[in-house]
Regions:
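A Rossmann-like FAD-binding core segment of flavoenzymes
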Residues: 1, 6-8, 70-157, 200-203
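Cofactor-binding loop segments of dinucleotide-utilizing enzymes, especially the Rossmann-like FAD-
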Residues: 41, 57, 80-82, 173
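FAD-site-proximal beta/loop scaffold in flavoenzymes
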Residues: 19, 24, 30-46, 133-178, ...
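N-terminal Rossmann-like NAD(P) cofactor-binding module of classical short-chain dehydrogenase/reductase
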Residues: 13-14, 130
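Rossmann-like NAD(P)H-binding beta-loop-alpha module
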Residues: 50-71
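Nucleotide donor/acceptor-binding cores
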Residues: 10-11, 34, 49-52
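A conserved FAD-binding loop/helix module that cradles the flavin
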Residues: 62-65, 171-203
Length: 203
């Protein structure tokens, strides 16, 4: 580990989770939890009857935009380089999401989100901003054990949460979607029990 300590183990469980990709604009960090969110599925209920902006170019963002039309009074979707499935884009627009082709430049607000400055100079007044730019995992650590991350930066596991390397298990968000606590808890239990069985079998 970082302090130089070496730990010897017969088994290891990767439960490093993921980190949501940030937009990297002023106001994002300061207003996180005060109108800035990285999960529309998690926080949609908090924005009933309010105005929101979805930020992202892929299918995840399209799905989130369509979802928020069921809750928000007005849903804007900023997608400046659309990569989403055209069918999902159409579904979001048909549901009422207003597609903006400019990129957010600054998230503004005093104590809470109030508006977003776009790179074309326009200002969108909203109560919430959902940044849906995907996520990255801590899979670099797993590469040292030759557990190659999948193309989507996840670790492939079997039903017992084992990986292709004997004795190495993975659970939670690092194994892919859905990124939900319930899944992480369940897989954590499975991985823990499987690791115990593996170690016992090696004695």
């Amino acid at each position: 580990i970082e302090d130089g300590t070496e730990i010897v183990s017969r088994s290891v469980i990767f439960a490093t989770g993921i980190s949501r990709r940030k937009l990297g604009v002023p106001g994002e960090k300061e207003l996180f939890g005060k109108g800035v969110s990285y999960c529309a599925v998690c926080d949609c209920n908090f924005y009933k009857g309010r105005k929101v902006l979805i930020v992202g170019n892929d299918s995840e963002a399209a799905v989130s935009a369509e979802l928020m039309t069921r809750y928000a009074s007005e849903t804007f979707w900023a997608a400046w380089d659309v990569e989403a499935d055209p069918k999902l884009v159409a579904k979001a627009k048909d549901a009422g999401a207003k597609l903006l082709t400019s990129k957010p430049k600054e998230i503004r607000g005093e104590g809470k989100v109030q508006s977003v400055l776009m790179d074309d100079g326009s200002v969108v007044e909203v109560d919430g901003v959902f940044i849906e730019l995907g996520a990255k995992s801590a899979a670099d650590l797993a590469m040292d054990l030759d557990i190659m991350p999948e193309i989507d930066d996840t670790i492939k596991v079997n039903p017992d949460c084992s990986t292709k390397v004997p004795g190495a298990f993975a659970c939670g968000d690092i194994t892919g979607r859905p990124w939900q606590v319930a899944k992480a808890v369940g897989q954590g239990c499975i991985a823990g029990m499987a690791a115990v069985d593996y170690v016992r079998g090696k004695k």
